[in-house]
Amino acid sequence: MIVLGIDPGSRRCGYGVVAREGARLTVVESGVLVPGDLPMAQRLGRILDGLDALIARARPAEASVEAVFSGASPRSALVLGQARGVALAAAARAGLPVFEYAPSEVKLAFTGNGRAGKDQMLRTARMLLGAAPGLSDEADALAIAVCHLARRAFAVPAAGAGRAAAARAAAARLRPSRRDHRGTP
């Protein structure tokens, strides 16, 4: 299975394409889209073009995107939301199911530490994947793809390809592994 991980941003959009065969993970392609010092609409257009070309080239089966971090300032959250919208649109336009993960969930799945810093993310990318990401955005995107591959058995798509209903039905069949406070399963 090949998965595209996207760390959205309006100035730098990290991407990582990771393939899994059995327990083996291989980086297909990774990098950072840098649209330049342009007005917002043009930067977003360049990111969309870059993601479209990447999806056509790498042919991932699914996409995973980092969810919005609400601790940012309102303006930063709005700008990040626009960049996320472009990433979601590129994946949906290609017919890819899209999965979203909180930053702490990505860090926990990738490093074992939900509060990992940039240096730890870069080191883990080198150790786990043999990758040498130049920027933290690239390492984060690789981590998002790896997180999705690790969580894939229980993931429910956020958008795309009409597989959401089947995934929700499968998730509904899962039973909790512990009892609730009333002692019922």
UniProtKB/Swiss-Prot annotation:
Binds 2 Mg(2+) ion per subunit. It is found in: Cytoplasm. GO terms for molecular function: crossover junction DNA endonuclease activity; DNA binding; magnesium ion binding. Keywords: Cytoplasm, DNA damage, DNA recombination, DNA repair, DNA-binding, Endonuclease, Hydrolase, Magnesium, Metal-binding, Nuclease. Its cofactor is Mg(2+). Its EC number is 3.1.21.10. Mg(2+) 2 binds at residue 66. Homodimer which binds Holliday junction (HJ) DNA. The HJ becomes 2-fold symmetrical on binding to RuvC with unstacked arms; it has a different conformation from HJ DNA in complex with RuvA. In the full resolvosome a probable DNA-RuvA(4)-RuvB(12)-RuvC(2) complex forms which resolves the HJ. This is Crossover junction endodeoxyribonuclease RuvC. It comes from Anaeromyxobacter dehalogenans (strain 2CP-C). The gene is ruvC.
